[in-house]
């Protein structure tokens, strides 16, 4: 089990991101420590999703840098997954979280399958395991994508709007799962608008 002393804080230093003529992030400095859930807040267009993209390494900033990213990699759950993008069952979708770094010819082992089962139960989608992902409601699909991210067991977990489109009961399951990840020493950062989800976070970083 990882502890918060095993994983350094992820730090953003002087981040500048431009999209065309617009400056989305302007010299942002922020730290994201392990062992706590950090919520990113701010108005639409304030740069929450952009910051997650930079932390995940999928977007290069115009200036500044991110340090402290551990060798174990980053698990990034994004909203930008259209329903038909993953023509898989829910179980196979979540199992994708166990394939990173694994040779294509090596099948998932018993421990991998156990981890997948745990995440399905954790997000209360075990009863949907054999359903195609594109047949699910938006909220069910969101829970499956969060479960995929959890299945990676990465030292850094980034989630864009983790409770988007889910009901209150499902939102509580997602929030509890994020808190559990933080409790095992993971760096957990999510962007949120929901006041209840923000209130459940340990820290809040507000973007102007």
Where are these regions (language model features)?
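Helix-to-loop junction immediately C-terminal to a conserved catalytic motif
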Residues: 56
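Conserved ABC ATPase "signature" region
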Residues: 110-128
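Helix N-cap at the start of a conserved alpha-helix in ABC-type nucleotide-binding domains
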Residues: 168-170
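The feature captures the beta-strand-to-loop junction immediately N-terminal to the Walker
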Residues: 41-43
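Catalytic Walker B motif of ABC-type/P-loop ATPase nucleotide-binding domains
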Residues: 157-161
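Conserved structural motif at the start of ABC-family nucleotide-binding domains
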Residues: 10, 25-27, 129
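ABC ATPase C-loop
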Residues: 149-150
